[in-house]
Regions:
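Acidic-enriched catalytic cores of C-N bond-cleaving enzymes acting on peptides and small amides
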Residues: 168-175, 184, 197-207, 241-245
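Conserved active-site "lid/cap" helical segment
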Residues: 1-91, 99, 156-168, 189-190, ...
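Short acidic, glycine/serine/threonine-rich loops at helix termini
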Residues: 19-21, 64-65, 123-129, 183-187, ...
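C-terminal catalytic subdomain
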Residues: 267-333, 344-348, 362
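Condensing-enzyme catalytic core mediating Claisen C-C bond formation in acyl metabolism
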Residues: 1-27, 139, 162, 173-177, ...
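Conserved thiamine diphosphate
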Residues: 142-191, 306, 355
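Conserved catalytic cysteine-centered active-site region
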Residues: 58-111, 115, 119-152, 192-221, ...
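Beta-strand segments within the central parallel beta-sheet cores of soluble alpha/beta enzyme folds
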Residues: 45-55, 82-88, 112-117, 169-177, ...
């Protein structure tokens, strides 16, 4: 990257909160996380030059669109800055981050605010599942099921089984690691939840089937929450460091990134990867891109990973696609204890989407 992008800091809401029960709106959520971020960093509103919002389904859950307009409602100093909202399903927050990076790299702005949020616990589970199904190809896939995404990820489990073989005990192990990690996170949705050992078995009482091979403990949470970060050019980061008596080297830098896409339908994705080593080649390619841009040759040069485990099979897929194991051999990293907190490559120390929670538009910003 020609222009280094610095991360000045930010904030995250408590993902255990139910904002509807508190009689608080999506605007209240927006304001709270923004103000927390301003306070924690010491940045003043008049220093922000551009605002980016990550949000997937605010229109459906709350009826609210044009969420970027909340910046000016929250602080009059922000009434003239350019703002935009980004929707890319579960990658909405990450795309908001990348868009802010592009603004800074192009030299248009020096200090960007990126805010991701989702307000989802105001409806029943069935309605929420239908809203989240907007990211499937409507009318083409997941048409005959109660829960679209558990249904879709069950198909991924089945495809893994056909191509490589899979033992669902390894998926249960992933779930347990993430829920255990979440107990250590003061912002995790599940930190105070109790999970008896039977939850990680095929017990229909403690771990009922949702769709196919996908059971309750395999599923990410329906979560309310928001996250906010400030990204800066080197010029703005130097000024911030001087103002706050910091060394520039004390401020984190985004070293690399990857961004790839694939056809909308799962069937199209799987047809494209037929005969190839990886189930989703574009996922392997984006990790290769990110490592290359960051100056790394292999994922094991990193100390660990935060990955998108909306379902346990998603993390299972990530393990081999990032190169930690050969394709289809994610189970080896699990059995060898590599991905737990005591392993040589911890995955999702935060608890991930399973343990920490998954307010969809906030997840990429939080990560």
């Amino acid at each position: 990257m020609s222009e280094p992008i610095y991360v000045l800091g930010g904030s995250q809401t408590d993902f255990a909160r139910n904002w509807a029960r508190e009689d608080l709106s999506i605007y209240d959520m927006f304001c709270e996380v923004l103000n927390q971020a301003l306070t924690s960093t010491g940045i003043s509103p008049d220093q922000i030059e551009v605002g980016h919002v990550g949000n997937f389904v605010g229109d459906l859950f709350t009826g609210q669109g044009l969420i970027g307009g909340f910046f000016a409602e929250a602080h009059p100093e922000l009434s003239a800055i350019p703002t935009s909202r980004h929707e890319a399903a579960c990658a909405s927050g990450s795309i908001a981050i990348l868009s802010a990076m592009r603004d800074i790299e192009a030299g248009h702005y020096d200090l960007a605010c990126v805010l991701g949020l989702e307000y989802m616990r105001n409806v029943d589970g069935q309605t929420g599942a239908e809203y989240l199904g907007a990211a499937t190809w409507k009318g083409v896939e997941a048409t005959d099921c109660d829960f679209p995404w558990p249904f879709m990820f069950d198909q991924i489990i089945n495809e893994y089984d056909v191509r490589y073989g899979i033992n669902c005990d390894h998926l249960k192990a992933i779930s347990k690691i993430n829920f255990d990690n979440g107990r250590r996170n003061p912002n995790a949705q599940t930190r105070q939840w109790s999970f008896p050992p039977e939850c990680y078995t095929d017990s229909d009482q403690f771990n009922p089937v949702i769709e196919g091979k996908v059971r309750k403990m395999d599923c990410g949470q329906i979560t309310d929450g928001a996250a906010c970060v400030f990204l800066a050019s080197e010029k703005a980061a130097k000024a911030y460091a001087a103002e706050h008596q910091l060394k520039l080297s004390d401020i984190p830098v985004i070293k690399g990134w990857g961004h790839r896409s694939a056809p909308l339908s799962l069937d199209s994705k799987l047809k494209l990867s037929a005969g190839q080593p990886f189930l989703f080649p574009h996922v392997n390619q984006l990790m290769t891109d990110a490592l290359c841009r960051a100056g790394f040759s292999h994922v094991t040069e990193l100390d660990g990973l935060e990955t998108h485990d909306c379902f346990s099979i998603t993390e299972y897929m990530a393990i081999d696609h990032i190169g930690l194991t050969a394709p289809g051999e994610s189970w080896k990293a699990i059995e060898e204890g590599r991905i737990g907190m005591d392993g040589d490559f911890p995955i999702n120390p935060s608890g991930g989407l399973l343990g920490l929670g998954h307010p969809v538009g906030a997840t990429g910003v939080r990560m």
